[in-house]
C-alpha cells in the first residue's frame, strides 16, 4: 500500500471548506460558476477523505477501548469484534482515495471522434467494421450519448471501408479511449461454402475532440484545396467545388471531407484535424512522461492488436490485460462495461505503481 499524502489531503479539505464559504457569500455569477465547477471536481475526493478520517477515528476509539484495562469485558469483546471490520473498511477507503488523487487526464471529460477502418480481410473486414460501429453505437445509446455521422465509405458487400463519427456526452473519452488499436475477428463468412474460419481486422481510433483553446492551428500552417465531390462510378454529384482537403503542412496530416456542403466540409475537416493534432500532442507527452506505461494497457499504438472476437467459440479476448469473456453476443450488442471497466482499473493500477516507484 502506497502511503497517502496527508498534506495533500489536508490541503484539499481546506480548499473545499474555503469554496463552501465563498459560495455562501453570494459572489457574482462568473465567480460562482468557477467556484461551483471546482466544488464539483473536489466533492468526490473530499467525501472519501472525510469518510476515511471518520473510520480511522472509529478504529482508534475501538483500539483504545480494547486496550483499556478499565473497560468491562462485554465492551472489550465488542471492540475486539468490530475493529477488524473497521480496518477492512479503512483499507477500501484508502484505495478509493488513492485512485481519486491520481493525476487526471485532461481529455477524459471531452467528447470523442470515433474512426473505424476496415483492415486486412477484404469484404469481411468491411462487414466487421460495420459490426464494430453498431457495437459502439449501441453502447453509446445505453450510456445516453449522442452519435453523429461525419463521413462514411460503405463496403462493396455491406459494412464500411471507413466510418467517422462524433460521440458526445458525459465521460465519453474516459470510457472509449482504450478502444484504439487493431480489432481482429475470427468467424466463418456467410459466403464461405466450406465452413472455414477466416481472420480479418479493423482499426479503431478514438480521438478527444479538441477546442480552439486546446490546440492552436495557424492559418499559415494549413493548405486548403477544394475539388468536385464524386459519387458512384466517379461521376460528379454536383457542379460546384464542394469537397475540401485540408493539409497541415508541419505534420503532413491531411483530412478530406466530400459531402455536398463546402462550408460544412471545411468545418468538419478542421474539427478532425484539430482532434488529430491534439491527440498527437497527448501521445507525445504520454510517451515522454513514462515509458513504463508501454507494458501496461498497451502502448496506445494504433497498429497494436488489442482484441480478438472469436465467433465460433463465442468469446472476446483483450490481449492487453489477458481478459477473456464468453459473452461475445452481448458484447457485440454493446455490453462493453466489463471490458471498459477492467481496462480503466488496470490503467489506475499502473498509475498507482508509478507513484509507488517515485522517490
UniProtKB/Swiss-Prot annotation:
Taxonomic lineage: Bacteria, Pseudomonadati, Pseudomonadota, Alphaproteobacteria, Hyphomicrobiales
Keyword Transcription regulation: no
GO molecular function, one term: translation release factor activity, codon specific
Modification note: Methylated by PrmC. Methylation increases the termination efficiency of RF1.
Chief place of localization: cytoplasm
Cellular component, GO, one term: cytoplasm
Keyword terms, alphabetized: Cytoplasm, Methylation, Protein biosynthesis
PANTHER family: LD18447P (PTHR43804:SF7)
Stretches for region Disordered: 283-309
Location of the protein in the cell: Cytoplasm
Protein name, entry field: Peptide chain release factor 1
Family of this protein: Belongs to the prokaryotic/mitochondrial release factor family.
